[in-house]
Structure formats: C-alpha cells, structure tokens
C-alpha cells in the first residue's frame, strides 16, 4: 500500500478555495495533533454532498495537476498499473488498487517553496583552491559577516572554512532554457561537477541535501563535521515549476523543498489481495 501521498499542486481555483475556507471555519477538525518534529497537523473532512460535487466539477475544469514531490513514486505506480492492465501478476493487489496512487493536492498559492541546499566533500581541494576555481568559473565572491540565505536568483551563499561567502553568477554563461537557467542547474554545471566532481547528485556519496526549513546553522554544522562545504540556494518559484512541466521537461533532482509536508502514515492507501 501507500503510506505517503504524492504531492500535487494546481493553479488556484476560487470555487475550491471557498469550500475549503468555509469547511475550516465552520467544522471541527477530524484530527489535530503535533508530530515528533513539533509540526502541527490539522485535518478536516468534507461530507456535504453539494460541496463534494462542486469540488469534483471544479477539478474537471482544471487543465493540469503538477507533481511537486513524488515523481519517482508516480512513475512506479504508473508502471505497476500498466502491468496490471496487461494481466501481469506483478503484485498481490486487485487491478483497481494498482491503477491508482494516493495524492495530496494543494493550490499553488497555499504552498511554500524553500531552497533545497547542498553540503559536500571538498574533493581534496583546499579552501583557497575552491575560492580560486569558483571565481574562474565566473562567480563574484563577497565575504559575509554571518550566514544568510540568498535573497535573489543567481545568487548563492557558500560556507567554507567557518566563513560565509556570497556568490553571484555574474560572468557565467546561462543558457536560455527553463531548466538550464535554474539556480540549481547553474550550480551543478559550473561548480559541483567541474570543481567537486559531483556528476550525478542523486547517487554520489560525497553530497547530501538539506531543506531550508532546517535553518542556515544546519549547513554550518554539516560542513564543520562530516562534510566540508555547504551551498544555500534561492528557492525555485512555483511559476518556474509549472513552466518546466508545461514545456514537457523535468525538474533537476533535489531542486525543491515544499511545505506543508504531510507526516508519513497520516493517510493510507491499502492494496487488497485478489
């Protein structure tokens, strides 16, 4: 079964928003608890048939649902569903179960996108070597008095040898492409791969990823302990995510950190045996 929903988003719909707002104001929540990470989770249910029908009709008019988190789970569910449709005994579940996966859907204006930051090994380079090679790659470098997240696109914060630096891609050749022009792509193509040897960030053991919700000090802690250098990135906009999807392209790996994050196990989609 599924214990964690795929995270979907859509362009705001006024009908759906009004019903959700009314439900939260007029009804008592079904669940209201605080998880182990001190995050509060509140869940309301909608049982009014008129509201449910209005939501269903509104979603029929929405052209696209965009995957914010759960691309691999969606692809896996699709493959399982195709096998079941072809009569393949790929699992012990009924055809209807296998052809569906669990999803949580949020309007785009209800999401908070945070930076998905990098911390990595220095690849045998000294601090001076790293600074020199980053400058040669076309970045300006400014020392900061304290750690801070970037405030604009094509700007990065780097923590190295207990010092924070602001990097700006001033002389970097940025392609006119919705994916290649993302900050995460600029950093990967011009810094992480050529300087640190990170060719595939999904599988390389010398890099790890830290959501901005954990704070700037977590990047310091990692670089001062099991890693050597950390990079903080400016968040990708929801508009960029939708533009990339509409263009038929795929977001780079580990490029977005979305909130709210539903706690795993809050919703279950069980597969029933044949």
Name each region found by the language model.
Residues 1-274:
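Surface-exposed, charge/polar-rich loops and edge strands
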């Amino acid at each position: 079964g599924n214990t964690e929903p795929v995270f979907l988003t859509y362009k705001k719909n006024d009908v759906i928003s009004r019903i959700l707002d009314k439900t939260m104001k007029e009804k008592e929540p079904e669940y209201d608890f605080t998880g182990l990470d001190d995050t509060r989770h509140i869940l309301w249910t909608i049982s009014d048939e008129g509201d449910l029908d209005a939501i269903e009709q509104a979603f029929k008019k929405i052209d696209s649902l965009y995957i914010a988190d759960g691309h691999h789970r969606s692809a896996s569910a699709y493959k399982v569903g195709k096998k079941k449709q072809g009569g393949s005994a790929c699992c012990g579940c009924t055809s209807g179960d296998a052809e569906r996966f669990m999803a949580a859907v949020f309007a785009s204006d209800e999401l908070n996108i945070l930076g998905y930051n990098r911390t990595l090994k220095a690849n045998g380079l000294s601090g001076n070597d790293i600074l020199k090679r980053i400058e040669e790659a076309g970045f300006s470098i400014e020392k900061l008095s304290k750690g801070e997240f970037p405030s604009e696109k094509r700007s990065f914060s780097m923590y190295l040898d207990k010092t924070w630096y602001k990097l700006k891609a001033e002389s970097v050749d940025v392609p006119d492409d919705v994916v290649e022009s993302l900050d995460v792509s600029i950093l990967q193509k011009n810094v992480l791969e050529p300087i640190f040897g990170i060719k595939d960030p999904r599988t390389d053991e010398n890099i790890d990823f830290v959501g901005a919700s954990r704070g700037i000090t977590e990047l310091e802690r990692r670089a001062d302990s099991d890693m050597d250098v950390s990079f903080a990135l400016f968040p990708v906009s929801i508009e960029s995510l939708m533009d990339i999807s509409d263009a038929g392209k795929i977001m780079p790996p580990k490029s977005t950190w979305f909130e709210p994050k539903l706690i795993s196990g809050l919703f279950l989609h069980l597969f029933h045996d044949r």
